[in-house]
């Protein structure tokens, strides 16, 4: 694009559909599910999420919704789901990504510091042109809202089993600081603004402005310290080089060693790091950090229904090529265990066909993905009394109670029910995750 703006349209974005039809661990069917998205204003396709027959994709300046209506493996219906991201022409890749399912049943995604100015379907303007953040909405695009701001460019989002949202944010490309492990709470501001980047290095000479950068000079980027600005939510720790794919073990993946573990791709240094968190006051601290995988430029990761870890290898570094590959990482000792088979079978099943009683049982399942789908289906059926019974039962499994509470939160407002909730919700429960 430096010589001819039409160069920006030369490379198409693609979504590939890969299938292992004979269960030998290798993809034997490959189709281009969708391609194009190569107008001069388009960014990279940095996020893809298939869910309940729809495929959502983040392609700056839009979030797209794709459908294969005739089941032939190709997206024959494509529509702009949300528009208005990328106010600035900032760094490539600082746009849209991180599509994931929240514990409240909403669609979450992250926005880089190219910023956004989005008009919601209800007519409200969400205007944050100089920073990144996290947004969420219903699956029909309604009730789009800003969940958090002040982030530079978190690539992917991961919820732990208690609904705490974490990510790893990119640094500001300023010599004095580095990437950060962040705890993202609703309404939080992590402090970053796009213009901070142009307050250090050679930029002040170019812009003829004083070299003063609040991000560095006011130590906004550092983990909590005495005297830190009170309006920001600081990072938990300095961490990583070039964060990319980020996922949390759903509970039955890999083996017991990696239960409750996060996995982060650090593609410039060719490694995937694993770690866990422990509560520390109102915050968390990182523990058990170590290299999980080394030697490939891993850009994205995800857990399959059978519990193995898929790793996308971005071979060739920054230049477009056809050397990329997808690898499978697993523990061969338990890869085909009965538990793994049961989880995969349940995830393939139609939760709308399961009985209420069975869904209640699944709220205590070891796998986070199954618990969430059971919760969502009970909420869809408006099973108020059943969910309240589990939530208020001190003898029920902890995670079943957590999901029952989330399910209650998904139900429509009802003043009569609110009175019953006020009497029966476990506000004084001995478990702080419940009360």
What are the roles of these predicted feature ranges?
Residues 361-362, 388-395, 421-430:
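Alpha-solenoid HEAT/Armadillo-like helical repeat scaffolds in large eukaryotic proteins
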Residues 58, 102, 160, 304, ...:
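Residue-level signal for short amphipathic helical patches enriched in basic/charged
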Residues 356, 384, 418-419:
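Core helices of alpha-solenoid repeat scaffolds
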Residues 360-372, 376-377, 381-384, 388-392:
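Periplasmic c-type cytochrome electron-transfer domains
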Residues 1-358, 373, 377:
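Beta-propeller domains with acidic blade repeats across secreted/periplasmic ectodomains
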Residues 341-351, 368-381, 399-414, 421-427, ...:
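Structural detector for internal amphipathic alpha-helices that build alpha-solenoid repeat scaffolds
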Residues 68, 415-417:
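Structural helix-adjacent loops and short alpha-helical linkers that scaffold large soluble proteins
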């Amino acid at each position: 694009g430096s010589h001819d703006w039409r160069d920006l349209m030369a490379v198409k974005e693609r979504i590939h559909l890969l299938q292992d039809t004979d269960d030998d661990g290798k993809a034997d069917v490959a189709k281009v599910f969708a391609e194009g998205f190569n107008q001069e204003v388009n960014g990279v396709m940095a996020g893809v999420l298939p869910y309940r027959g729809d495929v959502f994709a983040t392609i700056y300046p839009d979030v797209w919704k794709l459908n294969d209506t005739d089941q032939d493996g190709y997206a024959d219906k494509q529509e702009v789901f949300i528009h208005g991201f990328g106010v600035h022409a900032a760094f490539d890749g600082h746009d849209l990504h991180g599509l994931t399912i929240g514990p409240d049943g909403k669609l979450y995604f992250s926005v880089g510091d190219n910023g956004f100015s989005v008009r919601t379907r209800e007519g409200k303007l969400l205007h944050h042109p100089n920073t990144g953040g996290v947004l969420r909405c219903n699956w029909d695009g309604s009730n789009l809202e800003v969940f958090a701001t002040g982030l530079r460019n978190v690539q992917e989002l991961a919820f732990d089993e208690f609904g705490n949202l974490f990510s790893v944010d990119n640094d500001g490309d300023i010599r004095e600081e580095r990437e950060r492990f962040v705890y993202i709470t609703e309404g939080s501001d992590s402090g970053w603004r796009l213009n901070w980047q142009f307050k250090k290095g050679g930029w002040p000479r170019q812009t003829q402005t004083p070299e003063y950068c609040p991000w560095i000079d006011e130590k906004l980027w550092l983990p909590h310290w005495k005297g830190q600005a009170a309006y920001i939510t600081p990072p938990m720790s300095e961490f990583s080089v070039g964060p990319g794919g980020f996922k949390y073990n759903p509970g039955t993946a890999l083996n017991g060693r990696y239960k409750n573990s996060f996995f982060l791709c650090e593609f410039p240094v060719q490694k995937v790091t694993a770690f866990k968190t422990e509560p520390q006051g109102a915050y968390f601290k990182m523990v058990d950090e170590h290299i999980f995988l080394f030697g490939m430029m891993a850009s994205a990761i995800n857990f399959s229904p059978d519990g193995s870890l898929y790793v996308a290898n971005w071979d060739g570094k920054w230049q477009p090529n056809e050397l990329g590959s997808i690898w499978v990482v697993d523990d061969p000792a338990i890869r085909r265990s009965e538990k793994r088979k049961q989880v995969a079978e349940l995830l393939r099943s139609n939760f709308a066909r399961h009985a209420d009683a069975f869904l209640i049982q699944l709220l205590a399942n070891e796998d986070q993905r199954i618990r969430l789908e059971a919760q969502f289906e009970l909420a869809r059926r408006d099973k108020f009394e059943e969910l309240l019974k589990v939530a208020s039962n001190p003898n029920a499994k902890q995670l079943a109670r957590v999901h029952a509470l989330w399910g209650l939160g998904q139900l429509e407002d009802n003043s009569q029910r609110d009175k019953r909730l006020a009497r029966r919700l476990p506000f004084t429960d001995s478990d702080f995750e419940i009360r």
